[in-house]
Amino acid sequence: MKKMLIGGIRLYQKYISRFTPATCRFYPTCSAYGIEAIETHGALKGSYLAIKRISKCHPFHKGGLDFVPPKKE
């Protein structure tokens, strides 16, 4: 499941994102954040974190640095 989700993000990065203007308000970008979140926290929680992050990416949010939280042991 993780590989499939990450593969979808990579397809977006390669075939869609590169043809649109850079508008991400965050560092790392939302797609890079999504990949890291899924790799760190697994498919379910990583997807939740990625969707939560993407929902904040709009003109009324100031953006900035927003890193994937570390996995709790």
Swiss-Prot record:
Q: Which cell locations does it reside in?
A: Cell membrane
InterPro entries from the xrefs?
Membr_insert_effic_factor_YidD
Q: What Pfam families does this protein map onto? A: YidD
HAMAP family on file:
UPF0161_YidD
What keywords are assigned to this protein?
Cell membrane, Membrane
Membrane topology of the entry? Peripheral membrane protein
Q: Which Gene Ontology cellular component annotation is one that this UniProt entry carries?
A: plasma membrane
Query: Which protein family is named in the record?
Result: Belongs to the UPF0161 family.
Q: Does the keyword Iron apply?
A: no
Is Cell membrane a UniProt keyword of this protein?
yes
Q: What does this protein do?
A: Could be involved in insertion of integral membrane proteins into the membrane.
Q: What is this protein called?
A: Putative membrane protein insertion efficiency factor
